[in-house]
Amino acid sequence: MIAFIGSVFSPWYRWSGRREPQNHCCINMVTTGTDGRFTMTDRGRSALRQSRDSFQVGPSKLTWTGKELVIDVDEWGALPKLGKLKGRVVLTPRAVTGVEVRLTPDAGHTWRPFAPIADVEVDLAPGHKWTGHGYFDANFGTRALEEDFSFWTWGRFPLKDRTVCFYDATRLDRTKVALAVQINPDGSVCEIDSPPPLVKMKRTPWFVRRETRCDAGAHPAGVYSLLEAPFYSRALMRTQIDGEETVGMHEALDLVRFRQPVLKPMLAVRVPRRAGWKHKD
């Protein structure tokens, strides 16, 4: 689940010249399986409501209670699986970090790992009710991703006594981001001085390149695909870190592909525009 102000993957926002981020907001929810849905409705300024502790876009809302992030979802799935997706997700951080990471030297892009270790309770219709572990982070940017990056990959992997995150990216000027951090249960964060090597993996069905960091000699592999696109992949990845086998979340984003104009009309099918919205109160 991702909440956007200035929806970076919205063709409508791109076609608008990225002038008004508040006029292109959405709450993107993806569920999988037989009853899986993909929701990414691009909504206008009238749908957006913000306060210190809440963020609402149209019928869906995020609320921070001081201890939990409560996400009330009321969305409509895009093609090819139309239909309502409604319910609640509650994320309870084990701890909240104070870390902010610059992904570009001028802080034009930053990453905030708010709660890399969290418990999640999901109750969504149709067909999704479970509890497990999760995470809560955010990216902030003053420019389009494709204006600064050609490729990036990110992974979060829970271990027995900590969680590790890897952020590897190539900027358009060919400089690199190579970030490896360890998050402890108390919320303390430290950079990993000698991160494991970066290993290439099998490409996706769309031939998106994938790589992650793991122990030397290990063979990371996708175990469950969550979202595949011509420029993007999200999957559960099995790998080995410090001798421990783990399954975590992995993303890969090819921004050279995303930059191609031909993709924008394709995205418009999956990202419908709904400019008008009236809150009942």
From Swiss-Prot:
The keyword Lyase applies. It comes from the Bacteria. SUPFAM superfamilies: AttH-like. It catalyses: rhodopin = all-trans-lycopene + H2O; 1,1'-dihydroxy-1,1',2,2'-tetrahydrolycopene = rhodopin + H2O. Its EC number is 4.2.1.131. The keyword Lyase applies. GO terms for molecular function: hydro-lyase activity. It is an enzyme of class 4 (lyase). Pathway: Carotenoid biosynthesis; spheroidene biosynthesis. Involved in the biosynthesis of carotenoids spheroidene and spirilloxanthin. Catalyzes the hydration of neurosporene to the corresponding hydroxylated carotenoids 1-HO-neurosporene and that of lycopene to 1-HO-lycopene. It exhibits negligible activity in converting HO-neurosporene, HO-lycopene, or any other derivative such as spheroidene, 1-HO-3,4-didehydrolycopene. NCBIfam families: CarotHydtaseCrtCRhod. This is Acyclic carotenoid 1,2-hydratase. It comes from Rhodobacter capsulatus (strain ATCC BAA-309 / NBRC 16581 / SB1003). The gene is crtC.
